[in-house]
């Protein structure tokens, strides 16, 4: 959503982030001038404006402080505040966001009326709407300026788009819906069939609350999803007696929120809410595949679960140590959820990394790079198989989405062969072993060998070992030399060596 920022706000955010991501949240004046390509007067005025904005936003826990002796600037930030709050506040004040939020709730007779409402010039409004429409067209939406100024297009697409827009820009900072409170949505979700969602779970909870609130808002505005709308997949319906009872209770609670709708309309809109909840699935609180996936006749006709089972078995076949029954069920559930999301939402959230920056950047963690490097070829091979042709329309997203699933479902400390490590120390290796395991054990299957042994894959030592000693001890494996008290650079060296060894522990030697 950062593309909604105007040029002035973009420069402010760039300066903020430059200081924030610097060591100790401190940047020198020279770094800021050179890296941001600005003059000294511009730097001073921008910082002054940012500090004023931060106070105006109500985030007094933030401020940029100038250190004259060091010619540097430091971002003072308390533990209960986040830089994302400031960025979101700038987005909410941007003309593009103001236009979108205003048009969600009302239409206008002409551009002049909208211009007056959002305090943007007439020429500015035309420019902003033109740029917004370039993005909205991808979602089957547009801002019409014909007989009146309004947002038009597919109503289901609109609800998804606005739910994420509000989720990202308002987040947990404030609740933007005045007609219903957050805890009222929670109460409604308590009646949701437990096989698809549990209201007491925090996993994706805020996202679901925002979507349900947006869905109810549009229904209350008499903006209904056309009952003739074609979806590429069957809408959710309860298949077991327990789920049918929950579904009925859920419908009754939705009816209380929409008192002017008849039973048929309530049933249809509820079905879409539940289907969307299913599509956002792979919830941590759900440990078993929802019965809907394997009992619905339409899903069976399209070969939905055959696709899920094929992908799951293919992944399992490529692990050195296979999944347990429970782990396999969770993988199948994740694949079913993401595939259902593809068919239901189509291309509505095609650029998810633009919506939530960094969400797909798994390799930011250097200890995960080897895992990503192992999984990417597997996924590339999988998604190009003829058995996966049903997902061909979504191939651009498959690689990154499936990588997230496999990263979550495959524990490399369990499903790869062990890497045997010996840690040598001048005095005692006990502390080093503890630090080593604490830092790496979630990313590699590690086994400590407390002796010199041919089975050892890697030696780590805080003292040098001569070639003569290596020969006499018959040590042919690599040795990583580290400081007595390990530094960050030591961990990086160790990780690089573990990653090289891990390549042999994943797929290639599984059946050797």
Name what the model sees in each region.
Residues 1-512:
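A cross-family "folded-core" feature that marks the main globular domain of proteins
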């Amino acid at each position: 959503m950062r593309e909604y920022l105007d040029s002035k706000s973009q420069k402010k955010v760039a300066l903020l982030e430059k200081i924030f991501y610097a060591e100790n949240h401190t940047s020198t004046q020279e770094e800021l001038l050179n890296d941001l390509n600005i003059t000294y007067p511009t730097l001073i005025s921008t910082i002054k404006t940012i500090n004023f904005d931060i106070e105006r936003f109500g985030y007094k826990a933030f401020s940029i402080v100038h250190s004259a002796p060091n010619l540097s600037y430091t971002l003072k930030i308390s533990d209960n505040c986040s830089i994302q709050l400031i960025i979101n506040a700038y987005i909410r004040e941007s003309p593009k966001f103001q236009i979108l939020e205003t048009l969600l709730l009302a239409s206008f007779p002409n551009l002049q009326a909208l211009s007056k409402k959002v305090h943007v010039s007439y020429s500015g409004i035309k420019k902003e709407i033109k740029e917004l429409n370039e993005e909205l067209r991808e979602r089957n939406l547009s801002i019409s300026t014909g007989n009146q100024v309004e947002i038009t297009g597919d109503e289901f697409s609109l609800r998804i788009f606005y739910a994420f827009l509000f989720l990202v820009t308002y987040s947990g900072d404030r609740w933007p819906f005045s007609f219903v409170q957050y805890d009222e949505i929670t109460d409604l979700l308590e009646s949701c069939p437990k096989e698809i969602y549990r209201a007491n779970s925090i996993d994706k909870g805020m996202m679901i609350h925002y979507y349900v609130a947006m869905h109810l808002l549009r229904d209350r505005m008499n903006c209904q999803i056309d009952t003739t709308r074609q979806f590429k997949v069957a809408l959710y319906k309860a298949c077991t007696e327990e789920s049918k009872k929950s579904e009925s209770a859920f419908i009754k609670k939705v009816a209380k929120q929409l008192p002017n709708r008849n039973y048929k309309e309530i049933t249809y809109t509820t079905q879409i809410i539940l289907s969307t909840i299913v599509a956002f699935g792979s919830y941590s609180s759900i440990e078993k595949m929802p019965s809907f996936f394997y009992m619905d006749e339409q899903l069976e006709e399209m070969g939905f679960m055959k696709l899920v089972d094929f992908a799951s078995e293919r992944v399992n076949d490529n692990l050195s140590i296979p999944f347990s029954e429970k782990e396999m069920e969770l993988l199948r559930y994740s694949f079913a959820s993401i595939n259902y999301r593809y068919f239901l939402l189509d291309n509505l959230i095609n650029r998810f990394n633009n919506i939530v920056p960094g969400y797909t950047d798994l390799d930011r963690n250097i200890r995960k790079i080897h895992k990503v490097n192992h999984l990417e070829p597997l996924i590339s091979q999988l998604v190009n198989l003829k058995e996966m042709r049903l997902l061909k329309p979504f191939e651009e997203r498959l690689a990154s989405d499936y990588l997230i699933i496999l990263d979550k479902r495959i524990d490399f400390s369990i499903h790869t062969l062990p890497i045997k490590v010996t840690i040598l120390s001048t005095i005692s290796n006990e502390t080093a072993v503890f630090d080593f395991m604490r830092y790496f054990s979630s990313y590699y299957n590690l086994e400590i060998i407390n002796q010199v042994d041919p089975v050892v894959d890697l030696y780590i030592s805080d003292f040098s070992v001569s070639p003569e000693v290596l020969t006499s001890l018959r040590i042919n494996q690599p040795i990583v030399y580290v400081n007595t008290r390990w530094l960050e650079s030591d961990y990086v060296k160790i990780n690089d060596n573990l990653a090289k060894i891990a390549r042999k522990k994943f797929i290639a030697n599984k059946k050797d």
